[in-house]
Amino acid sequence: MFGKGGIGNLMKQAQQMQEKMQQMQEEVANLEVTGESGAGLVKITINGAHNCRRVEIDPSLMEDDKEMLEDLIAAAFNDAARRIAETQKEKMATVSSGMQLPPGFKMPF
C-alpha cells in the first residue's frame, strides 16, 4: 500500500511537513497585507492573524457621507482578509508539494 520504505518513509515525510508547516505559520503571522477599496481611497493593512495594523482614508472621503465611508472600510478589510487567505493557501501548497501521499489522503489543516 505504501510502497518501498513503507510507513517509516511516510512518517518521515509527515515530520518534515510538520516542520515546514510551523515555519510557514510563523512567516504568515509576521506577514502584512494591504487591502484596498474605492480605487485606493481606503486602505487597510492586516497581519497574518487578521489583526488590523493600519487604516488609511483619503482626505477627500471625510466630506462624503458616513455610510459610504463605512462600506469602503468594510470592503478594504475584506479585500485584505482575502489576500491573507490566498497567501496562506499558496504557502500551504509549497509545504505539501513533493510529498508522496496515498491517493485520497486529506490534509488535517
Swiss-Prot record:
Its recorded name reads Nucleoid-associated protein ECA1177
The stretch of residues making up the signal peptide is none
Subunit structure as annotated in this protein's UniProt entry: Homodimer.
Q: Which organism is it from?
A: Pectobacterium atrosepticum (strain SCRI 1043 / ATCC BAA-672)
Instruction: Write out the entry's keywords from A to Z.
Output: Cytoplasm, DNA-binding
Gene3D superfamilies, sorted: Nucleoid-associated protein YbaB-like domain
Q: Function of this protein? A: Binds to DNA and alters its conformation. May be involved in regulation of gene expression, nucleoid organization and DNA protection.
Q: State whether keyword Glycoprotein applies.
A: no
As for family, the record states: Belongs to the YbaB/EbfC family.
Any single GO molecular-function term of the entry would be:
DNA binding
> Which GO cellular component terms are attached?
bacterial nucleoid; cytosol
Q: Give compartment(s).
A: Cytoplasm, Nucleoid
